[in-house]
Amino acid sequence: IYGKKTPGEVVDSLICEGTIVCSGSVIDSMLGYDCIIHRNASVEKSVILSGCYIGQGAKVKNVLMDKNCHIDPSVEIGYDIERDAERFPFRTPNGLVVLPKGSRVHNDGPIEIAYDLVEVLRQDPSTSEIMRLHEGKYIESSRNRHSFTAVGD
């Protein structure tokens, strides 16, 4: 409601300096430096590294998010294992979604991986097969969006 202050909720979590939680909820999670968690967003059982952005109304559960990732408003991750398996190339056997550094998750469509990491992930022996199997299920970001650029920059 516009003009009304709504408290955020933080339970059993660690939130680092510079991170802002705007009346969202953070439960059993760790948030790195300089993250922004927007209104009505929720983070549960997740590790979010520095410089990440979680949009208004987004719900993130069981996610390991590397630095400088961006989650669009109303996105849900970790609530539909089958959808997550189709959408996200990197997942652990128990369903934890791993987002590479500088990734962006849109409401619909494929995950956007920072262009400077795509070739690294394709060449790395530990990730090359996953990238090959998921070809067409992710997109490469434009050249003006680097993995080392924080959302606020």
Spans of model-derived segments:
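Left-handed beta-helix
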Residues: 1-153
